[in-house]
C-alpha cells in the first residue's frame, strides 16, 4: 500500500515540477488524525497499527494528513453538497459500513477517534463473526462483503457455473444484476440487510437527533426500493418532526466519486480555518 502511494506521489511530482505537494489520505477504520496512525483497520489483512503519516513523511519529505474514509465523505458533503446544513450524517455502505457526523458545522470524532462505527453496532449477539472480533455486527448482515458471501453459498447450491465462482467471489455487478432481475433469494438477503441498516440508523437518530442523512457506497446501486426499506425501518421514530423542514430526510448522496475523494483534501482547509487569525 505504501509503495503504491509513493509511486502515485512521484508520478504527480514529475508532472507538476516545482509545485509543492501535500498528501491527504483516507482509510477505513479507526484513525488518529493528530498522529496520522491507522489504529484499527478491520478489513485489512494486518491487525497492528500503522503509522501512515510518519512513514510517508519520512519517505517522501512532504506533509501528510490521514483520516477516516467516512470523514472524507462528510467533508465532501459539507463543502460541495447543495444543501448548507450544520448537522448531518453520511453513511458509506460498501464492502464495510461506516458513518461520520457533522455537528454544528464541525466533524465529530470522539475522544478516541472511533465515532461513526455504525457497521460495528451489534444486531444479533449470536450472529456471524465480524472482522472486528465480535459477533453479529451490522457489517455481517448488511455489507456488500457479507451479502456476497451468502449469495455465493446460495448460487453454489443452485448449481451455478463453477467457472463463474472459481475465484471464490460473487462480483458486485453480478449481485446488483440478480437483485434488479428479481432473484427472490438475493432480494431477501439484500432486504434483510436494508432493514438492519434502518434499525441501526433508527437508534442513531434517537441518540443524536440528526435529520439529514446521505447514503454513499456501491450498495446504493440496489436503488430506490432498497432506500425505501431503510427509510421505512426508521419511520417509527416517535421523536421525529412532522413538518417538511425538520423531518428526517434519508437520501442517496449526489456527489460524484471524484468529488467524494476530493473531500479528504478539505482537511487542510478545515485546519487553516481553525487557526487563529
Locations of the language-model features?
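Short glycine-rich anion-binding loops that position phosphate/pyrophosphate groups of nucleotides
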Residues: 28-31, 94-96, 219
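Glycine-rich phosphate-binding loop and adjoining helix at the ATP-binding site
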Residues: 1-6, 10, 14-87, 227-236
Amino acid at each position: 500500500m505504501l509503495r503504491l502511494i509513493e509511486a502515485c506521489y512521484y508520478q504527480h511530482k514529475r508532472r507538476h515540477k516545482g509545485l509543492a505537494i501535500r498528501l491527504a489520505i483516507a482509510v477505513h477504520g479507526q484513525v488518529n488524525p493528530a498522529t496520522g496512525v491507522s489504529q484499527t483497520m478491520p478489513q485489512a489483512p494486518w491487525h497492528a497499527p500503522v503509522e501512515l503519516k510518519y512513514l510517508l513523511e519520512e519517505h517522501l519529505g512532504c506533509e501528510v494528513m490521514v483520516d477516516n474514509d467516512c470523514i472524507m465523505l462528510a467533508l465532501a458533503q459539507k463543502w460541495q453538497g447543495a444543501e448548507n446544513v450544520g448537522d448531518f450524517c453520511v453513511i458509506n455502505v460498501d464492502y464495510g459500513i461506516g458513518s461520520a457526523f457533522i455537528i454544528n458545522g464541525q466533524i465529530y470524532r470522539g475522544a478516541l477517534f472511533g465515532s461513526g462505527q455504525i457497521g460495528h453496532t451489534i444486531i444479533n449477539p449470536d450472529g456471524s463473526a465480524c472482522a472486528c472480533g465480535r459477533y453479529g455486527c451490522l457489517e455481517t448482515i448488511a455489507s456488500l462483503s457479507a451479502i456476497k458471501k451468502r449469495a455465493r453459498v446460495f448460487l453454489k447450491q443452485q448449481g451455478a457455473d463453477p467457472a463463474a465462482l472459481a475465484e471464490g467471489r460473487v462480483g458486485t455487478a453480478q449481485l446488483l444484476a440478480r437483485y434488479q432481475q428479481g432473484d427472490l433469494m438475493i432480494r431477501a438477503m439484500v432486504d434483510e440487510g436494508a432493514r438492519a441498516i434502518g434499525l441501526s440508523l433508527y437508534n442513531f437518530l434517537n441518540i443524536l437527533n440528526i435529520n439529514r442523512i446521505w447514503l454513499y457506497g456501491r450498495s446504493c446501486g440496489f436503488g430506490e426500493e432498497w432506500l425505501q426499506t431503510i427509510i421505512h425501518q426508521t419511520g417509527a421514530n416517535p421523536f421525529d418532526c412532522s413538518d417538511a423542514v425538520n423531518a428526517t430526510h434519508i437520501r442517496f448522496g449526489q456527489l460524484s466519486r471524484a468529488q467524494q475523494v476530493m473531500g479528504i483534501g478539505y482537511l487542510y482547509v478545515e485546519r487553516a480555518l481553525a487557526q487563529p487569525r
